[in-house]
Amino acid sequence: FAAWLRKWMFTQRWQTWQGITRTMLWLLFLPNAFYIISDIMHLKTTSTSNVLYDTALLLSFAWNGILLGYIGLYYMHRQLLLRISRRSAHVFIGVILLLCSFAIYLGRFLRWNTWDVVVNPAGLLFDVSDRVLRPSVYPQTFTTTLTFFVLLGSMYVVVWQLIHVLGDEEKA
């Protein structure tokens, strides 16, 4: 989605209904890139003989998903920097990472997935609004979302800095 959206944005206006639709589709599927991190919780049920293999396999999938997710996020970040202030772009990316973190919670603990936006929007909206309107009833929502937000945010800062360091190396 990210490469498709990026290519489209170079030739078309982002503010059209097509641009908004493509951006919403990208945003809808972005949390899937990071979700696999939460599969680490299944390693505790793995037999001792397979734990190294399972860990290596899971981390390789997680690495690829995270990297692809951050590439897409970086593309979007660069486009935002062309259109809005630097501070607003950073805040917008932070909000996207917060939404991704909340989506990971929804998928891992409430078992919602991307397609439920289409096949069961009322049920999804109920669960989301219930947790947003009554956060004290669902402390796991806050702690899980915050944990993933800190993890995803700090990892993205490293990726952002790494891209800029490598860019500076090429200029030298």
Segments the model singles out, each with a brief description of its role:
Residues 40-41, 106-120:
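Interfacial helix-loop-helix junctions of multi-pass membrane proteins
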